[in-house]
């Protein structure tokens, strides 16, 4: 059978941070994060300890494989004129972004989708840098897909389910969290912050949630980062007399280190010390509404730009 030349060959290249698949991968992973500079023994042991506490690896790699597979099915159902292939590449673990990109020249169109819905030109730049030698007018980039209606719906459903587990008489404060970014002179993160605020406000409005705060987590140890920190917000919530803190990690797309350790271990410990109950809303992980939000970003970019 000859190939139908009227069918466009569309590739969606999904980019994410990546995560070590085992403790043996931690050193190489950490070295790449540090732009080729080897971590000290103390730094390496600290990161290994975190992975050991969450079972030796995060769920990111397994979960994103499922998300990518579901995204391909969703897009193929929507794009009758195309044969859709969705491939995945990582920033700090194999398969690396540049290695995957060099194999995509035979596609009619390549659409690049960052797993972070709240992208800006600045935040996306480090993901796109390895692609520059391969990009041409057949490549399109989804810069931000936080406006996808089902992104808010995905969170609303899981927050609603979580609220049903709270005991009668609980007084919860809701803390939406996202990854902090370093503050640098002349650089604005307003687009990132505003995208997160809109999603937070959408969730709060749909569920009529009072007492909702956006807090920044997982900051580095050097320089100044966005505030308020999740540590400071948790401290204040305790001082205000709330019995429960409900964390909604809207800045993340699946269960990984920043959720399993930075929230489930560190914030849980802090809540217990303050006499509060720790509650976390489940991550998008295997939520089909979240996959539809990813597809929205791809379709909006692909069809809008022709």
Predicted features along the sequence, with ranges:
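Active-site-proximal alpha-helix that buttresses catalytic centers in soluble enzyme cores
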Residues: 2-306
């Amino acid at each position: 059978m000859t190939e139908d030349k009227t069918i466009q060959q569309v590739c969606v290249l999904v980019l994410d941070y990546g995560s070590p698949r085992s403790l043996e991968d931690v050193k190489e992973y950490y070295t790449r994060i540090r732009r080729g500079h080897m971590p000290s023994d103390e730094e390496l042991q600290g990161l290994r300890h975190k992975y050991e506490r969450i079972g030796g690896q995060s769920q990111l790699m397994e979960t994103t494989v499922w998300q990518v597979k579901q995204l391909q099915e969703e897009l193929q159902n929507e794009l009758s004129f195309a044969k859709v292939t969705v491939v995945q590449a990582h920033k700090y673990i194999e398969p690396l972004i540049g290695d995957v990109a060099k194999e995509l020249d035979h596609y009619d169109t390549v659409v690049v989708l960052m797993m972070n819905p709240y992208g800006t030109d600045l935040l996306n730049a480090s993901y796109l840098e390895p692609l520059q030698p391969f990009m041409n007018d057949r490549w399109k980039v989804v810069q931000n897909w936080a406006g996808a209606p089902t992104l808010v719906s995905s969170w609303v459903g899981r927050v609603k389910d979580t609220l049903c587990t709270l005991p009668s008489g609980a007084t919860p404060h809701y803390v939406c969290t996202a990854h902090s970014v370093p503050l640098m002179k002349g650089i604005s993160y307003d687009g990132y912050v505003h995208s997160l605020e809109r999603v937070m406000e959408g969730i709060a409005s749909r569920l009529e949630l009072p007492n909702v705060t956006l807090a920044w987590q997982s900051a580095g140890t050097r320089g100044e980062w966005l505030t308020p920190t999740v540590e400071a917000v948790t401290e204040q919530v305790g001082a205000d007399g709330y019995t429960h803190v409900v964390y909604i990690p809207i800045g993340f797309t699946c269960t990984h280190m920043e959720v399993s350790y930075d929230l489930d271990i560190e914030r849980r410990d802090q809540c217990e010390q303050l006499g509060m109950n720790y509650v976390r809303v489940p991550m998008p992980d295997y939520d089909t509404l979240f996959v539809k939000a990813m597809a929205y970003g791809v379709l909006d970019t692909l069809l809008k730009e022709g």
